[in-house]
Amino acid sequence: GGLIIEPYYNRVLDFGMEFYASEQGEIEYKGLSIFSTENRAYSGNLLANEAIKEDIVNQFVKQELLQLVQVNICSQLASAFKEKYVGNFGVDMMVVTTDDATTFKLHPCVELNLRTTMGHVALALSPTDFAPKKMMKIDYLDKYHLAINLVGDDLLDTNLVR
C-alpha cells in the first residue's frame, strides 16, 4: 500500500494532450482531450474538432503556453521513451484558479498515462470540422454504459467547465 498527498486545487477545466511514441523514439502529438470527472473519476469526453477544443482551453490558457507545453512534452519524453516505450500515452492537465478567482493557471502534468486513454478514443470518435459537438459519457450501473449525445454551444451544458 501507499499514501499519496496532493494539494487541493480550485479546478476549472480538466483536459489532456494525447500522444504516440514511435519505435524510432519520436513523439507525435495527436490532439487535445477535454474531459469531465465525477468524484475524481473519469466520466466523459467532449467530441469536437481540434479548433473548438483549443478555443475552450484558450479561454483560460494562452495558445502559446499550450504549444510550449506540447513541444516540451515531445522533446523531454522522446529521449526518455526511446527504446523503452512504444505506443499511445496521454498527459492529463487542468486549469486551476487562484483562491480569489482572478487568475487562471495551467497545471501541466497531473498524470502521465502510458496507455491508450479515453482521450485517444474520443479523438477517434471526434467529428469533422462541420459536425456538431457531442459528449461521450460513461456510466456504471451494474455494468459500463457508453452514450454519445449532442451538446449545445453553451459549455455549461457539457459539465466540463466548473
Where are these regions (language model features)?
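Short hydrophobic beta-strand that contains or immediately precedes a catalytic carboxylate
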Residues: 109-110
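Short, mixed charged/polar active-site loops
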Residues: 14, 26-27, 104-105
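Alpha-helix initiation and capping sites
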Residues: 87, 103-106, 115, 119
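ATP-dependent carboxylate/phosphate-activation module, predominantly the ATP-grasp catalytic core
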Residues: 19-75, 113-140
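A long amphipathic alpha-helix within ATP-dependent nucleotide-binding catalytic cores
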Residues: 1-10, 29, 41-103, 143-161
